[in-house]
Amino acid sequence: MVSRDFIFWEVDVQADFMLPGGKLYVPGAEKLLPNIRRLTDAARQGRVFLVSHGDFHAPNDPEFKIFPPHCVKGTAGAELVPEALTDKVVRVENDAAAKIPDDLSNYQQILLEKQTLSIFETHHADALVQKLGNQAEFVVFGVVTEYCVSFAVKGLRERGRRVAVVQDAIETLNPEDGQKTIAEWQRLGARLMTTDQALSALG
């Protein structure tokens, strides 16, 4: 049975970030893949609903003035790694005309596309969080700690949701910045857990 107490929230687990040789590879990110798979397996098994989001950029995206080109939509680098995907995914483009399905129970996972660091700058993130309600705790994991993961954690907290972060399923670019970011999350009321703890909590 799908948990009513937890929702898993997966950030940018895409080939260009996660794999050596990726366009914006996060050193060490591939070491997270066993835990990413374990967390995603829980959604595959119908134990928890999985929200995922990722970068899906146009070739001339303005972000490429700040970061090297990465996760260009339609390229292999933009795709979620296999460990991060379930068998029943609904994908929602960042377009006002796109729709979140009325009944998410037909799916194990929803994948929201974004073009900026914050998922909450997209058309559908707020509506999805509203639809998911405020009973469940949102369990966040992925990359990168001090960028998109942090925007997700802070965005969920700003919307009054309880948040936990899976500390052995996130990766940072700069360890010092990562520690400061984690401390900020804790000040905002987010808690830390391990992959084992996240899975045990599902019962």
Model-derived features: positions:
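Extreme N-terminal starter segment of soluble prokaryotic enzymes
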Residues: 2-8
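Residues at the starts of beta-strands that form the adenosine-phosphate
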Residues: 5, 49, 137, 161-164
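Short acidic-hydrophobic, aromatic-tinged amphipathic segments that line or gate anion-handling sites
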Residues: 190-201
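Active-site flanking residues adjacent to catalytic metal/cofactor-binding acidic residues
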Residues: 9-11, 54, 141, 167
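Histidine-anchored nucleotide/phosphate-binding helix
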Residues: 36-42, 147-158
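A short glycine-rich beta-strand->turn/loop micro-motif centered on a GG-aromatic cluster
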Residues: 139-142, 161-175
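Acidic/histidine-rich helix-loop elements
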Residues: 18-29
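Active-site alpha/beta core segments
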Residues: 34-137
